[in-house]
């Protein structure tokens, strides 16, 4: 935070964030917390925080949130059906951003009118933010960077998150058991 300065780079790898912002009770789900999946950064301070091979789905707010950090790195991540942006890379006060992405899949079949929030500033090399392997949800039509490359439900094994059982493989990677 501003009072203490930026922190060293944090690396999140092979992780899953789902259902954040809710607590199960006897009467169903109740609101609790801000509901972000992966929230990386704050106060427009640089940190070069890294998230690799991770999945965010069914969160009350954003799936992957830079939280105003201007230089996050996102590699091989999937974000699906979060109630706010699946992917939000933005800053409030930094003059320049240096986001680096590769292999992002952002997809929805719910909350389809909610686009990803991608805001390059200043000296940002947009090729690093819009890599050819990235699929962002830019509108209700599911636009990718190139309109000829759209994802549909058919691109996924299953999108049923109600029955998914998230486990780990012996090597530590995520086993989504068919989701995605």
Regions found by a protein language model. Name each.
Residues 83, 90-180:
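Acidic, glycine- and Ser/Thr-rich low-complexity intrinsically disordered tracts
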Residues 1-27, 39-40, 46-62, 70-83, ...:
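Right-handed parallel beta-helix
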Residues 63-66, 86-89:
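Extended hydrophobic-aromatic, low-complexity segments
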């Amino acid at each position: 935070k501003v009072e203490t300065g930026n922190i060293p780079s944090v690396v999140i790898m092979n992780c899953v964030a789902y259902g954040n912002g809710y607590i199960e009770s006897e009467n169903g789900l109740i609101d609790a917390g801000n509901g972000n999946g992966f929230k990386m950064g704050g106060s427009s301070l640089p940190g070069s925080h890294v998230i690799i091979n991770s999945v965010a789905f069914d969160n009350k707010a954003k799936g992957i949130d830079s939280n105003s950090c201007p230089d996050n790195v996102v590699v091989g991540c999937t974000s699906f059906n979060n109630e706010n942006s699946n992917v939000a890379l933005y800053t409030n006060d930094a003059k320049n951003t240096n986001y680096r992405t590769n292999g992002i899949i952002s997809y929805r079949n719910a909350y389809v009118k909610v686009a990803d929030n991608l805001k390059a500033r200043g000296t940002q090399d947009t090729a690093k933010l819009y890599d050819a392997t990235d699929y962002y949800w830019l509108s209700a039509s599911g636009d990718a960077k190139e309109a000829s490359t759209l994802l549909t439900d058919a691109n996924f094994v299953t999108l049923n998150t109600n029955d998914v059982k998230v486990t780990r493989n012996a090597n530590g990677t995520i086993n989504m058991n068919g989701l995605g």
